[in-house]
Amino acid sequence: MRCLPVFVILLLLIASTPSDTVPLKTKDDMPQASFHGNARRTLQMLSKKQCCWYFDISCCITV
């Protein structure tokens, strides 16, 4: 029974220590634009261009 208070105190000390597994986020760590958003933007840009022939650049019309 004498070990029980020591065990409880150790558990409380372990629980109160800061965790190193989760890094703090800073402004520099924020994720950039997602790949999905970039792909969607590229597809929208390509869908706005209408070309009659791929080798005739003068025929291309950007709407």
From Swiss-Prot:
The keyword Thylakoid does not apply. Residues 1-19 form the signal peptide. It comes from Conus textile (Cloth-of-gold cone). Contains 2 disulfide bonds that can be either 'C1-C3, C2-C4' or 'C1-C4, C2-C3', since these disulfide connectivities have been observed for conotoxins with cysteine framework V (for examples, see AC P0DQQ7 and AC P81755). One of its GO terms (molecular function) is toxin activity. Belongs to the conotoxin T superfamily. This is Conotoxin Tx-D0111. Residues 20-47 form a propeptide. Keywords: Cleavage on pair of basic residues, Disulfide bond, Secreted, Signal, Toxin. InterPro entries: T-conotoxin. Expressed by the venom duct. It comes from the Eukaryota. The cysteine framework is V (CC-CC). GO terms for cellular component: extracellular region. It is found in: Secreted. Its main location: secreted. It holds the Pfam family Chi-conotoxin.
